Amino acid sequence: MKNKLLFMMLTILGAPGIATATNYDLARSEYNFAVNELSKSSFNQAAIIGQVGTDNSARVRQEGSKLLSVISQEGENNRAKVDQAGNYNFAYIEQTGNANDASISQSAYGNSAAIIQKGSGNKANITQYGTQKTAVVVQKQSHMAIRVTQR
């Protein structure tokens, strides 16, 4: 509930930016949180990254306006990447487990994508080229792979 409240608060504030977070050198498990505010506030870009565990990596690139990206990682050796261009796009990646790999690429207008991985060794990729597309991938086992492309 606390994370959802924080997410909503930052969304309303419209924290802009591009964010990258890694936690390679933590001696113990901690919560690593990053919000970056590098671009103009008029773009209304938000990148929120939360990490618990070790050796997790998250990368977000945003070009456009009204973009929101949320990445949550718990475990070890998880990789997440979001690449957003265009306007009014939303991307969400949640990883629980180890050695999961997820990426979302969005362009155009009004797209929503979510990847939820619970297990180990999963791979998922969502690419959205069109307008007003929605895609959700849920992987609850280990060593699963999927690629979704929407035009």
Swiss-Prot record:
InterPro entries: Curlin_rpt. GO terms for cellular component: pilus. It holds the Pfam family Curlin_rpt. Residues 1-21 form the signal peptide. Its main location: other. Keywords: Fimbrium, Signal. One of its GO terms (biological process) is cell adhesion. It is found in: Fimbrium. The keyword Signal applies. Belongs to the CsgA/CsgB family. Curlin is the structural subunit of the curli. Curli are coiled surface structures that assemble preferentially at growth temperatures below 37 degrees Celsius. Curli can bind to fibronectin. The minor subunit is the nucleation component of curlin monomers. This is Minor curlin subunit. It comes from Salmonella typhi.
